């Protein structure tokens, strides 16, 4: 996509940055000769990739193409009309530029909007937009963006520092006078308040108060200071109802203003943000905004080049390299710096605090989305930043009483479900972060997991925890509501993962007692496994599963009752810490292969069909499940198919990027690795996309990946063998220590599947089954009517949950004279299942009424008791 023009622009930029070499080496493919490592990775980032609209299921991808630094406070980027995340490449109408952005799924950010224009002001400038040119004049590279407005002739260029956006705007000489709109009351989620102050003839300051993310109650206020390179000759304000020429200030939820300049002006506009105060924004501007536009642009490019150089790749065509480095770039945009240059920031308690010198306080954690693949990547590449991220969350908890869920600015939105901040923290820690308050971090995890985690303004980190601990699962009650539907099943699955992460973290700190408790709790997902249907299903507080099949097709809406953004088939596979236990529950390897083959027949279906939704987070790890069941060649094939959903185009992603979640998935998949088990450093493998790759570890060591034949016209798609530090390995996963010590991985590849390598049971990645129940039970019809003197039967469905358990017994107990049922015993079938018929006899002497029978099913060292209600009534003739 405009690659030649993009590379020319980058060549000029890199020369200014001091990064230019005598010539820019193109990326050779394997058939060009020996693959050469990419020398300048910023040359291969195109920020317009993934900024458009995908297919019907994909919808808006919601990436922004504008200027930012790694993990910066500012994301200075264009906006298009009626796009809730800011920008859509397929939309030709632009409202200008704003200072904050993220690839979110609800209206958010877009704070402090500005529009350079020559169109006369008119009576409603707060609604103004201009046509934007999505052609070869629109260029986006790390730290720089430029675009043309064909209707007015204005050319805009943007660059950024951590807390400042710098714009250069060229107005046409032969045209209307230059105008510059500033809209503090135009945040994408709307504004509860906004101010604007024209302080002198080169300075505008103000604030925007926004929030209400996805209908939640969060609020934040961001302040700004804006400095123009030349005095303006006219000015005014508006309030969303009228325009006030000559007015210096405005205080309205629709606040805005304008300033005017002569035709042909070339303006540099520097805008700094602060979440503390206008004075904080001024100080940030003074500290970061003094250099020339070109010098800032070059420095930002250098910063990005250093960050992206943590991973070097060689081989493959330019399109794949561009996709890879653009995805790596997007993996380093969030979370965001939240403190000013002097260290001050607004806390969750509404009080101004200061972060320790040399550290950064971060905000904006889309935890449910990012803990799976983004947190491991950031922890591996940037452990010191990752440490500050964890400490920021720990500090948030200390200020508010609990960890936030989907933290935006300085408050918890409560968006999504689960307690996903826990595996986010533990993944960052496992992959390298160490410099934070470990004791306090564990304390707040355990507090929420046992007491609920009471935060501010009614926020609960784990709502419904008392019922969860009493029942061993999240029931279908209001406390387990998520995104408009009650999601007890998916919450239970998430909390099982969360508790496993707590167990691993506690164990690493030497707290073996806590580790054991939460390891046992990590198996609570088994309490929702319905042996009648073979699904992990929602369950009532009384213990009943829904009637009918486990998967229910919904022709509309956003998923199935009991599940957050998905359905029973999609969530079935989310037991990453005990895949072996799930395989046993589903009847063993052969049965699971058939089911997984059917599930991956389609790759990106959305929340309502019983197939993989590759663009949504619960399905991220599915392609690697074949590594657990003896068919790793299908992992290699499926990962390759999903990678094909990405590409170097505006529509080149299978879903909403969710603050780098989807992009980080691609980075791992392209390297041939995936962090399969949250809370651990287990990396399971697939065929790499590049002939060579090097992951530079901060310790000075590296992970070297060699896969001859991965690139080229006739690329080899299947793993034929693997050596780790020159030792042959038949395992489909790497030693956990490799993320610390580094190592050399050499993949031997082939054009056809090797159906021997990696197929042994010992080759599967580890599962953590301690605390598992040996059996799960359901009685689909627990109410039975029997007339006196007759016998009825109920069916007990049971499923073995641990391999090696062969025998079961069913013991019905009645405490009513005249009602009897005989015990029975037997062996599970080859799939570990049984449907046992229990005969219940009612004597003629038993009066009409309701009588419970307690049916206990035992296997191994586990026993589960369910109640059958016998309704005795005389027959009606």
Curated annotation (Swiss-Prot):
Please name the Gene3D superfamilies in this protein's record. 2.70.98.10, alpha-1,2-mannosidase (1.20.1050.60), alpha-1,2-mannosidases domains (1.20.1610.10), GH92 mannosidase domain (3.30.2080.10)
Region forming the signal peptide: 1-32
Q: Name one GO biological process term.
A: carbohydrate metabolic process
Q: What is this protein called?
A: Uncharacterized glycosidase Rv0584
Q: What class of enzyme is it?
A: hydrolase
Entry EC no(s): 3.2.1.-
Keyword field:
Glycosidase, Hydrolase, Signal
- What are this entry's molecular-function GO terms? carbohydrate binding; hydrolase activity, acting on glycosyl bonds; peptide-N4-(N-acetyl-beta-glucosaminyl)asparagine amidase activity
Q: Which NCBIfam families match?
A: aman2_put
Family assignment from sequence similarity: Belongs to the glycosyl hydrolase 92 family.
List, alphabetically, the Pfam families matched.
Glyco_hydro_92, Glyco_hydro_92N
Q: Which PANTHER family match?
A: PEPTIDE N-GLYCANASE PNGASE -RELATED, SECRETED PROTEIN
Q: Which organism is it from?
A: Mycobacterium tuberculosis (strain ATCC 25618 / H37Rv)
Give the domain of life: Bacteria
Task: Please name the taxonomic classification of the source.
Answer: Bacteria, Bacillati, Actinomycetota, Actinomycetes, Mycobacteriales
